[in-house]
């Protein structure tokens, strides 16, 4: 008999969101040599190959990010009105309906026998479709301490534990439908490795490691074809020069090529380098905070061109944290999000404008904002994007206030004013023009 999560998970398990979009590149000390790769956890450094177009692999699918949904729908958690349990819900884009993720005919979805109900704990991530009816999840404490990658059955119960470790990064994982690429720090080690997991056999291969210096991390920040873009960083130490490095790693062989080295600067501005990076549509985009220049480098031919130098400067002129995040490409427009605040003025509002860069013309325009949403007493002007589909975005689109009752530490009940948040689909065109034309598909909380 196959177990379900709610029959095995301990109470201390906490839910963590699966993040898909990398925000900043990170750092690595001593990047001039390529770290160990090609299936060995302690391989000798190998020289970087010359920049060249990667060999074609027509018989193998391209990699894609793993997340809690696909073109057909999206998984969420919801706490039951009674507060006794949580449910996994599935929002179906085709029907526009949201329902418990349970395939048992006649189930009332309110007892431990329902695989969508969790009375004693929840996985770290929701079901993540990888194709052909296969789902993965990242869970804490399944059978032992630490974290596991598990394959789920059709009722979202644990079918097989594929990999177990003390730490697995679920922030950015890639799949081709048959394998999973992820970052992990094995038990007893102090630096990260990029591993490939065969989803059929559970076989594990180390493709790339961050070296043997304590505290070094390696994180996947993007993918192109069957290659990973990996950012390698050290534990920050202001007493010595350090650099942040990007590598292009072959997902099959582990062959690594050093793409970039960025000096780590003073972290007082809220970031560690003067370059913000993103990997979109087989291209590495880089924004230079010092010059204001935005460039694009093709990951196949390594040709670099200037996209624009017309992005506006920091609204608060360096008086606080300032972040520029390159997020996505929609209808030929590169979406660039700003975050700026003023540490010298306690009353200053955080500014979060969004700019659109026309990739053909290089022109820059501020994106018209969608109407702000108010929840828990505050206006939220930034649009929360949950997923990007082929021609639509899944976004938070509506809120609704409500009153809920809970119990204090003294056992006495009390009420809390809160908000339900709803999500829906919006076309690229409507998002870019700030037109709130949503197709609502579900409730987030």
Segments (PLM) and residue ranges:
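Bacterial N-terminal signal peptides that target proteins for export
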Residues: 4-19
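Repeated scaffold domains used in trafficking and secretory/extracellular systems
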Residues: 59-70, 112-129, 167-177, 213-225, ...
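C-terminal motif of bacterial Sec signal peptides marking the signal peptidase cleavage site
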Residues: 27-30
